[in-house]
Amino acid sequence: MVHFTAEEKAAITSTWKLVDVEDAGAEALGRLLVVYPWTQRFFDSFGNLSSSSAIMGNPKVKAHGKKVLTAFGDAVKNVDDLKNTFAHLSELHCDRLHVDPENFKLLGNVLVIVLAKYFGKEFTPQVQSAWQKLVAGVATALAHKYH
């Protein structure tokens, strides 16, 4: 279990309320698919993923990115219970989708980069550290069913 200090929780919640879930989610998932092209195999039904412009403009990537980032909203609300919060998604990604759990870490790291881009100087080392801790906790929770 990951323990968050009051300061870390405040850093996460204060930035999260400013995040455009649709825009940031699309960018995070799109960047994951561009930078780590082997992750595209989990998205065969998404159509054209042949180039970075095709990926970033793909409506299915945008829609799923929003869905993914909406789930991160659940993490923000439940930082003290990530394992139970993501139990269903862990089971889905393990049993049905067969997603390599390492990909959860990759997506988390990409999300932190996207957030840093959006917040600029406001994304202080303390804020970044809190978010890194959260995305690592989410990745661990999503990988739980694999163990």
Swiss-Prot record:
Keyword annotations for this protein, in alphabetical order, are:
Heme, Iron, Metal-binding, Oxygen transport, Transport
Q: Which Pfam families match?
A: Globin
List, for all copies, the residue spans of the domain called Globin.
Answer: 3-147
Q: Does the keyword Zinc-finger apply?
A: no
Q: Which top-rank group of organisms is this from? A: Eukaryota
Q: Tell me which tissues or organs this protein is expressed in.
A: Red blood cells.
The cross-references to CDD domains, in alphabetical order and at most eight, read: Hb-beta-like (cd08925)
Which Gene3D superfamilies does UniProt cross-reference here? Globins
Annotated PROSITE patterns:
GLOBIN (PS01033)
Q: Hey, which family's this protein in?
A: Belongs to the globin family.
On assembly, the entry states: Heterotetramer of two alpha chains and two gamma chains.
| Protein name per the record | Hemoglobin subunit gamma
